[in-house]
């Protein structure tokens, strides 16, 4: 029971941070695995979520409880498909929409992006993940790695804890910005992506450095209210000022296949 209460607090705090970072508007959710169930934020503005408003859903659920986001099926599908997934964030970074419309996969072009996976796949169906079948099809695109771009529908990130999933969502937004900027700056020249060895070296230190990123995000200006264990009853969320989300350059990018790592990528002609 104590662990469950702490985990509810972690989910709620992560949700409020996600809102404060400007990565969600009226839509988005955070969840955590809790044994044979998951704890997920309600279908509500994440800026006001508290531990008491987090909802428990069995992983084997065939019907969603009242108040649960309709795309909770995506969380359930990922928990079933990925036993290593302990927490999930669902958001709509602006740059993620741009990359998912322009590419079929995003390979890291800077080191921290490797903490999202050896590459970030794009699920190509823009329909909402409001059914088991659609959610399972999306989950099948992420057999490994920690981030999935959803064409026309935002993104999903995984983590060892709710805060780690949110840190990866922030990092995914930043990685998409860098990717788009690199494509714009390169002009007619191909973009050089990280090699397999470079990706492996960055992934090797992710467990050490990603928690530092989460601490930075949770402690930033307008920090999101009480931390887990500090909430009393419904609690009073803190200052939820939301900075502008990541900017996106308008680019005319064609769909690409996965580039060769460690060498400039080449679009098919």
Task: Give the residues covered by each predicted segment.
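Intrinsically disordered, low-complexity, charge-rich segments with an acidic bias
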Residues: 228-244, 254-269
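Glycine-rich flexible loops
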Residues: 1-228, 242-252
């Amino acid at each position: 029971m104590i662990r469950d209460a702490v985990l509810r607090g972690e989910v709620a705090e992560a949700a409020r941070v996600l809102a404060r970072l400007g990565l969600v508007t009226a839509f988005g959710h955070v969840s955590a695995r809790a044994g044979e169930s998951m704890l997920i934020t309600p279908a509500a503005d994440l800026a006001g979520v508290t531990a008491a408003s987090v909802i428990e859903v069995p992983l084997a659920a065939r019907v969603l409880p009242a108040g649960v986001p309709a795309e909770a099926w995506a969380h359930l599908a990922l928990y079933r498909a990925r036993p290593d997934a302990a927490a999930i964030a669902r958001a709509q970074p602006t740059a993620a929409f741009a990359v998912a419309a322009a590419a079929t996969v995003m390979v890291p072009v800077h080191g921290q992006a490797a903490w999202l996976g050896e590459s970030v796949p794009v699920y190509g169906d823009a329909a909402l993940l409001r059914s088991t079948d659609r959610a399972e099809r999306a989950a099948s695109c992420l057999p490994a790695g920690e981030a999935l771009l959803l064409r026309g529908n935002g993104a999903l990130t995984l983590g060892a804890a709710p805060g780690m999933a949110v840190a990866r969502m922030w990092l995914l937004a930043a990685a998409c910005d860098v990717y788009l900027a690199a494509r714009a700056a390169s002009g007619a020249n191909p973009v050089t992506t990280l090699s397999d060895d470079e990706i492996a070296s960055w992934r090797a230190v992710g467990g050490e450095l990603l928690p530092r990123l989460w601490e930075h995000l949770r402690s930033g200006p307008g920090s999101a209210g009480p931390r887990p264990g500090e909430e009393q009853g419904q609690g009073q969320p803190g200052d939820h000022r939301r900075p502008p989300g990541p900017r996106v350059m308008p680019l005319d990018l064609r769909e690409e296949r996965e580039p060769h790592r460690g060498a400039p990528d080449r679009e098919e002609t």
